[in-house]
């Protein structure tokens, strides 16, 4: 048996960025049809035979933690709660040695009935996407009348000890930008952390409009009209710049992916549900790790492909450059 080093060699790109955070999409399927993400009829989902099995997911995460220095794994989708047997998969991942910190990004539907099981399996934290508090607007944005399920999921996650519970919202001009203050106040009242994310050109329809993007600066201006904000800064390589609402413990963060890119400190790498490694959210090329696994490649070969991919990572996403090219995969097929 191959002897592994006690401390894995860091996963470093040519700019010296060390990658410790893995975003792993478990499915491209979703039970919502958000207007800024996909068409009403949905997308052509991956055939199930092309989706990584639980054994393949566990093996790739194990290679990441044992050989590459991955310390955090966020499970994403599509909607990861649609993955059958998710608590069992989480339990297997949390039993790895070394074990990564496990978190999940979800739309919250189904979280009310699974939060306790996920926490007991080893999940630490949860981010829930919620762009509005108004039931009729939620139905318009998501094309589904499920806001009660999302709110119940938030409460269940908090009560199960999946802390911090963070709410992710994408403010879009003329759609929900009038709820920025309300969302922050709601989060503070219920013990959640709020994150406002600038919209990015990752929708399946290719309809992203920069003029409808509400910038991080605008978000802070609107919050500042209601709250006194105390700067907290940015934690390590986290993308969110954080503020505390004065007189409370409530935190509000903004992720300025477009107007203040943080590519220079990026520590993330992504795996899609069909086993394609992406060294950047906006990458136009992928490395096929699934084929390596299914051809019987050993761990060292998979590790080598992983390092080669990250070694070729570019300096940034180039959204603000005339040469910017959208990735062929939409966000729902990449994983957030």
Region annotations inferred by a language model:
Residues 51, 57-74, 79, 83-197:
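Radical SAM/AdoMet-radical enzyme domain recognition
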Residues 32, 135-136, 261, 287:
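Glycine-centered loop/turn positions within well-structured domains
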Residues 33, 37, 83, 136, ...:
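Residues that scaffold the ATP/ADP-binding catalytic core of kinase and kinase-like folds
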Residues 42-47, 134-141, 203-207, 288-290:
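A short acidic, helix-capping loop that chelates divalent metal ions and anchors anionic groups
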Residues 14-55:
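Canonical Radical SAM [4Fe-4S] cluster-binding loop centered on the CxxxCxxC motif
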Residues 28-30, 38-41, 130-132, 198, ...:
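Short, small-residue-rich loop/turn micro-motifs
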Residues 1-22, 181, 185-189, 199-336:
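Auxiliary Fe-S-binding modules of radical SAM enzymes
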Residues 2-19, 35-36, 70-74, 112-117, ...:
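Conserved N-terminal glycine/acidic-rich loop preference
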